[in-house]
């Protein structure tokens, strides 16, 4: 087997448990062991950079880099930026009237923050899942800011069967769903896989020398792209179907078990 030199990890549902709202101790120890072995480890998340800082409170080491906002903003531990791409401003202008008319909740992601047009029961559900009951706050200026600010991603609180309605107004964008109640929206040519390409090009690592772990629909492109794509046991069926390997859940040492299976640790 090709020696693995870089591994990419989703956060929520992959290294962080939805049940305990934290990183299992064994998973943290395994991640640290990878670094000690000289393997580079990277976060690959739909979260914006400011929503990844909590990792510093949970771990006594740093990742080598971060693929954030589903690949739209990628940077190394030293702060060097490898990828920086915003959503089509034309798409955003086109879809805002649809959101208003249909009272659709949307969170607009910036690099250093986010703002929301309205809150509803689906938003409350996500706050509970993330263990952050006050994460989202309505901004009365949301629609004005959506036009004037650089928006990297939308979190649109619709069910899968409702996606087509708003995507009809966003021809340069695509949905990247990882849960039932909402979908991430990113550029059509974006995705965590583009972040992987930026990272390995920087370090001179071959694609076949990479692994990726994920559990959600927004991880599919990444898992298909990496040398070895591993779906967590708690992943959706659509994710498991495309994975090279299905491990146990995040709460049952899924990261560690898969790495042992492939003799990485």
Predicted features by range, described:
Residues 38-42, 63-64, 151-154, 208-210, ...:
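Short active-site oxyanion
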Residues 59-62, 70, 169-172, 225-226, ...:
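Short, structured coil segments at secondary-structure junctions
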Residues 98, 102-213, 217, 221-222, ...:
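Conserved acidic, metal-coordinating active-site core of Asp-based
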Residues 25-123:
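Active-site phosphate-binding/coordination module
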Residues 34, 154, 196, 223, ...:
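Residue-level signal for inorganic ion chemistry
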Residues 225, 233-265:
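Asp-based, Mg2+/Mn2+-dependent phosphohydrolase catalytic module
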Residues 3-20:
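Asp-based phosphoryl-transfer active-site loop
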């Amino acid at each position: 087997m090709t020696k693995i030199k870089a591994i990419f990890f989703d956060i929520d549902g992959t290294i962080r448990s939805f049940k305990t709202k934290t990183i299992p101790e064994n998973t943290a120890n395994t991640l640290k062991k990878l670094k000690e072995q000289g393997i580079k480890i990277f976060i690959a998340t739909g979260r914006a950079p400011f929503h990844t800082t909590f990792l510093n409170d949970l771990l006594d080491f740093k990742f080598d880099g971060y693929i954030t906002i589903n690949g739209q903003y990628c940077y190394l531990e030293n702060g060097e930026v490898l990828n920086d791409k915003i959503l089509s401003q034309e798409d955003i202008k086109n879809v805002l009237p649809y959101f208003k008319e249909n009272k659709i909740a949307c969170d607009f992601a910036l690099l250093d923050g986010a703002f929301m047009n309205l809150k509803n029961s689906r938003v409350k559900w996500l706050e509970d899942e993330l263990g952050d009951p006050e994460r989202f706050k309505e901004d009365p200026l949301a629609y004005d800011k959506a036009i004037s600010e650089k928006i990297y991603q939308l979190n649109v609180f619709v069910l899968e069967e409702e996606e087509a309605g708003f995507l009809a107004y966003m021809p340069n964008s695509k949905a990247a769903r990882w849960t039932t109640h909402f979908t991430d929206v990113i550029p059509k040519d974006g995705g965590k896989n583009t972040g992987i390409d930026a990272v390995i090009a920087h370090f001179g690592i071959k694609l076949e020398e990479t692994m990726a772990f994920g559990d959600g629909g927004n991880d599919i492109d990444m898992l298909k792209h990496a040398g070895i794509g591993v779906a967590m046991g708690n992943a959706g069926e659509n994710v498991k179907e495309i994975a090279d390997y299905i491990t146990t859940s995040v709460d049952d040492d899924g990261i560690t078990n898969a790495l042992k299976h492939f003799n990485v640790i």
